[in-house]
Design a protein with these regions (language model features):
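Non-catalytic, usually N-terminal nucleic-acid engagement modules in DNA/RNA processing proteins
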Residues: 1-185, 298-301
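A non-catalytic, amphipathic alpha-helix used as a structural packing/dimerization or gating element
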Residues: 128, 132, 159-170, 206, ...
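Hydrophobic alpha-helical packing residues
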Residues: 23, 164-171, 211, 240, ...
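Glycine-rich phosphate/ribose-binding loops and adjacent secondary-structure elements
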Residues: 162-165, 174, 178-180, 186-307
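C-terminal extensions of enzymes
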Residues: 1-17, 25-34, 41-42, 145-151, ...
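Generic secondary-structure signature for well-ordered alpha-helical cores
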Residues: 138, 169, 173-176, 242-245, ...
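Conserved, mostly hydrophobic/aromatic
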Residues: 23, 56, 91, 133, ...
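Glycine- and acidic
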Residues: 150-153, 158, 218-224, 333-336
Length: 377
């Protein structure tokens, strides 16, 4: 069960819905990153519901290593394990795997690397990634792709694109096999293919054209937001977008700042994820409608205003900047929890405002009014 419905369009920006076995996602949407099946900062799944999270994103590699995907399967899959009723997306593990692997350990069959926990040698290829994600029983599984370092030579990027295409074919075949097994927890698991090609426009376009032929449930643009200038990222999105199936959701992986999201939406992207809101919060950097504030600055010690006077989140309704700064400085867990809750609310509310603007036909105006204020670095 997977159906993307385009409700409205303003320029290339899309307002739609994406139906899954675990509920309907209103797009554009931000997926909240729960690497080890939990948000870093002490938020529960109930908290996520209250702050408007639609999709939780979990990490295949980390859950494979600890507690183990077999254990999660025995517990009924990620939804029962975490008591999260809404959609879950699992990444393929590729990004972590390739950061741990040496170049000469990357073969056609897959990748050999060592666990960051105990040093144990692990092999992962397309079939293994699909098997792990099937055990996790996520709503959406990401295809296993090669995450090439940026910059990469043109020739290597071309070889990598071709290999990632072959791996996607294997991922699709393995998922079809797994979804047909009688003991598979989620027989309606969806598969998203991933576009690669570094910052080479022709490789990106060729690769997108080829993976689109495989009729996946959705498509992602990967390998960006890894140090390249923002202008390169925007150029690649614009180059690839015309070749992305219009009837499938589009996901920009690992992005990004509020400004990046606004630019991505304007170029036709539906889904985003990033560790930035939770990571920044844990270091006292909090998002507001007027930009980021750094609670580490001494000027906030006696500040009795909420983090953002324009925000209606549970944190801003009750607590002051001065109090949250004190908690963070004292190392109190509550400080991290409140900061993370605010930042994730900010991101989820940003997406709700974007959807409302698209509904009203006023997205261009919304973007122009807010993009200058937001951190667009």
């Amino acid at each position: 069960m997977a159906k993307y419905t385009l409700l409205k369009k303003e320029g290339n920006a899309r307002r739609g819905t994406f139906e899954t076995v675990h509920g309907t996602v209103q797009t554009p949407a931000f997926m909240n990153v729960a690497t080890a099946a939990a948000i870093k900062g002490g938020l529960s799944t109930e908290d996520l519901e209250h702050i408007g999270c639609q999709v939780m994103l979990c990490n295949t590699y980390h859950l494979h290593v600890r507690p183990g995907d077999d254990l999660v399967a025995d517990m009924g899959g990620l939804h029962r394990f975490t008591d999260w009723k809404r959609p879950i997306l699992t990444d393929s593990g590729g990004f972590q795997v390739f950061s741990l692997a040496k170049l000469n350990q990357i073969k056609e069959e897959g990748v050999t690397f060592h666990s960051h926990v105990n040093g144990k040698k692990i092999f992962m290829g397309p079939e293994e990634s699909m098997q792990i994600q099937s055990h996790l029983a996520s709503t959406i599984a990401m295809a296993f792709d090669e995450c090439v370092e940026n910059p990469a030579t043109y020739n290597y990027a071309k070889q990598s694109c071709a290999r990632t295409l072959r791996w996607l074919e294997r991922c699709k075949a393995e998922m079809e096999r797994l979804n047909a097994l009688p003991d598979t927890i989620n027989k309606n698991q969806l598969l998203f293919g991933i576009n690669q090609g570094c910052t080479y426009d022709d490789l990106r376009v060729w690769h997108m054209q080829e993976i689109a032929k495989l009729d996946c449930d959705g498509y992602a643009i990967g390998g960006l937001a890894v140090g390249e200038p923002a202008e390169d990222m925007y150029r690649i999105i614009s180059a690839v977008e015309p070749y992305m199936p219009a009837d499938k959701p589009r996901y920009l992986m690992g992005v990004g700042t509020p400004g990046n999201i606004l630019e991505g939406v304007s170029r036709g992207v539906d889904l985003f994820d990033c560790v930035m809101p939770s990571r920044n919060a844990r270091h006292g950097h909090l998002f507001t409608k007027d930009g980021i504030i750094n609670l580490n600055n001494a000027k906030y010690a006696r500040d009795d205003k909420p983090i953002d006077p324009k925000c209606d989140c549970p944190v801003c309704r009750r607590y002051s900047r001065g109090y949250i700064r004190h908690l963070l400085k004292a190392g109190e867990m509550l400080g991290m929890r409140l900061a993370v809750m605010h930042n994730l609310y900010f991101y989820n509310n940003l997406m709700a405002e974007i959807r409302q603007a698209l509904d009203n036909g006023s997205f261009a105006q919304y973007k122009s009014e807010y993009c200058v204020k937001l951190d667009t670095r």
